[in-house]
From Swiss-Prot:
Family annotation (InterPro entries): Ribosomal_bL34, Ribosomal_bL34_CS
Pfam families per UniProt: Ribosomal_L34
Lineage per the UniProt record: Bacteria, Bacillati, Bacillota, Bacilli, Bacillales
Gene Ontology, cellular component aspect: ribonucleoprotein complex; ribosome
Family of this protein: Belongs to the bacterial ribosomal protein bL34 family.
Region (Disordered): 1-45
HAMAP family with a match to the protein in the record: Ribosomal_bL34 (MF_00391)
A single GO BP: translation
GO molecular function: structural constituent of ribosome
Organism: Shouchella clausii (strain KSM-K16) (Alkalihalobacillus clausii)
Name of the molecule in the record: Large ribosomal subunit protein bL34
Biased composition (Basic residues): 10-20, 27-45
Keywords: Ribonucleoprotein, Ribosomal protein
Amino acid sequence: MGKPTFQPNNRKRKKNHGFRARMATKNGRKVLARRRQKGRKVLSA
């Protein structure tokens, strides 16, 4: 049995899944648009 695979790191989390990261690419903006359309309270990490 190995180590737990989830190693929390807020900096990495924001850098990869944060709002600014989403806005930086065309597909990321599509993600936000879908989540807005769905009515998600939280759009990104």
